Amino acid sequence: FILFSACLFLLSACNNDKPDAPEIQENPIFKVSMQDIQKAVRDALDNPINGMPNFDVPVIDAIDSIQADYRPAQSTEKTHYRKTLLYFVKLVKGPTVMVGADKRAEPIYGILPNADLKFGKGKLLAQDQLQAPCRLMIGAAAASALCAVETTTTPNPRWALLQTEKGRNMAGWQMTKCPVVWGQGYPLNLLSPSSEGPYADRGKAAAGSVPVALAQTLTVFKKDFSVFYGYNLKTSWAKLRNRTSNTSFTAGDEQNDIAVIVNYIGISIGQVYNKDGSATATLRRGLDFLSDYLGRSLGYDQNWNNVSRNMKANSHGITLLSVGEQNNDALWKRLGIERPKSSEICLLLDGFEQKNGATLFYVNSGCGEKANGYYLYDDKIWQEVARSPYSLNMKVYNLYTTTDYDEF
């Protein structure tokens, strides 16, 4: 089991630099102990997929936290407090596990294999070094925890299921289907306009999350082709779709081919570039592009209840997650996270794990592997019809080919 004494020191150390507002002291039945954190970490790593190693003796390297401005429900005091929402448990030679810091919240909020995050005084630091999708998904986890502690009055029953046979669902997972985590920078942005803004890479604007997500989708739907809208590939698509990261395009022909494909998709869907080096496009137009290219064999629905079922039932079943412009400034301010300003962010969901009855979707963010991982799906804040104080205004498009479509 995880080294207790070292972990206890780290847990207290993560709050040594206290912010100005005092930490709220609430009912002890909501307190998350080190033993609870240990159980949550072990549960998060149970039945790992996608090549994550199975840790027999996971050892914690560091524990950090995110806090939010907080006022207890029905409080008549004017004092503002700080509430710890999430623990970020970094393992030695392992992933970072996001664990709820209050038992009204969920035990597990995420498993991030390659996270490189910095914290201080309960805040996420160096946010300008994180792409918008990464901040978005971390903010989604923190918002979910905040919603739980402010809208519920009893402990979440999933804490009692940690490391129990009843809590395990060995059939509740789907291996990811998209092999790539290319990102939006070099070489995909080779043909983007010149830019010196914060989102530029090597002097070029970002390739854009929507065309990159569409190119990623093609790696699932198309095994090979030699001509892409009149452009003759110098290498085969079969090779390109197996270049798992943007650093794996070593040959000039490969770099040029993938840049042309992503750039042409951007042109076809009317992508525009902003002064800061970011790119803006509409996923709706992207779906029309995909449908045309796949010979009208593409089908999709927008039913949140079908996301995991579509992945299981259909060989090409994946989901594009669309996040519109966020207007919930007060929520992001409370979380201390910079609100993503892009008009639309497109993320690929192509796998999932179920932990104690909760579903964590694998998010391929389109901005590199450090932003990818499993994130807890919370229907109270993800969906566009979610309650306004915590809503993230997300929409899903569950994609499949009409040739392999199965009724659920």
Q: What residues fall within each predicted segment?
A:
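C-terminal motif of bacterial Sec signal peptides marking the signal peptidase cleavage site
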Residues: 10-13
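Exposed beta-strand-loop-beta-strand "reactive/processing" segments of non-cytosolic proteins
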Residues: 53-103
